[in-house]
Design a protein with these regions (language model features):
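Short loop-to-alpha-helix "cap/lid" segments that border enzyme active sites
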Residues: 197-203
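Cleavable N-terminal export/targeting peptides
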Residues: 1-61, 271
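Transmembrane beta-barrel domains of Gram-negative outer membranes and organellar outer membranes
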Residues: 58-192, 206-215, 219-271
Length: 271
């Protein structure tokens, strides 16, 4: 899709399984993983903006929720709108919708910074959280290997359940001939960001180009918490310069009881 980029991170979604509302709120406080207003009109406006502004193709800032090892070049600006929704109730997660905007800017020296706005989920009270993020790529080899580190700071500003939180990660990727890219790394979330206690684990990604317009992708956060989801899907070129993402997030726990939902993302570059 960060900076965590979580698509920018540009930018990264989860679930306290104790109750569905807590689960979805925790999930969207995070994304790796970011909304302004939860009105459906925001989605319509954002989609029109995506179509209207001419942009160049750019590196992918996140896969879906897991940050990619791509970093924007200096002066490049990327924006994205993520739309998550579950159309029906289940015993684990009730129906909901969420809109998550983010913007990412390349600052040079293989560094990008971004801002995500999370916490607006329908139905329920707004719990808007500002999530500034940074990603740095200290290594990019001609052998296809890359290494990045990143950090997200969570600052709740409405209906605060905690004062501040943090997500830090490090990961490597390997790009093979034909374009296949595998990503693997580790993460740490501080208390209250994705669970009532600190959580650490692994984050993984897979990207396989099919042609110039379509790729099959998937990512996964390990762990039983509000970021613990496996999300497979596709990345596609909506137009010559606009990218769309369509995936389905499946929880690491209680999936058989309905802990899964749709995830759509629309991204574009301003330059």
């Amino acid at each position: 899709m960060e900076t965590t980029t979580i698509k920018g991170e540009g930018t990264i979604v989860g679930n306290y399984q104790s109750n569905s509302r807590q689960a979805t709120e925790a999930l969207y406080r995070f994304k790796n993983q970011n909304p302004l207003s939860a009105q459906p009109v925001l989605f319509v406006i954002a989609f029109i903006v995506v179509i209207a502004f001419p942009t160049k193709h750019s590196a992918q800032q996140t896969i879906f929720n897991v940050p990619s090892t791509d970093v924007l070049d200096k002066g490049k600006v990327y924006a994205e709108l993520d739309v998550s929704f579950k159309p029906s109730d289940s015993s684990s997660v009730s129906k909901f919708s969420s809109f998550v905007p983010r913007v990412v800017v390349g600052t040079g020296s293989r560094v990008e910074i971004g801002l995500n706005i999370t916490g607006n989920i329908q139905p329920g009270p707004d719990s808007t959280t500002l999530v500034p993020a940074i990603k740095w790529k200290p290594y990019q080899g001609e052998n296809g290997w890359a290494f990045v580190v990143g950090d997200h700071l969570f600052v709740p500003i409405r209906n605060r359940a905690y004062d501040a939180g943090n997500y830090v990660y490090a990961e490597v990727s390997k790009t093979f001939k034909g374009g296949t890219r595998l990503t693997a790394g580790g993460y740490d979330f501080t208390k209250n960001v994705v669970a009532a206690a600190n959580r650490a684990g692994g984050q993984f990604g897979f990207e396989q180009p099919i042609n110039k317009k379509l790729s099959i992708v998937a990512d996964w956060f390990t762990g039983k918490h509000s970021a613990g989801y496996f999300t497979p899907g596709v990345v596609f070129k909506v137009g010559p310069r606009v990218t769309g993402y369509a995936g389905y997030s499946i929880g690491n726990q209680n999936a058989s009881n309905g802990n899964h939902f749709f995830l759509l993302e629309f991204g574009y570059n301003f330059n």
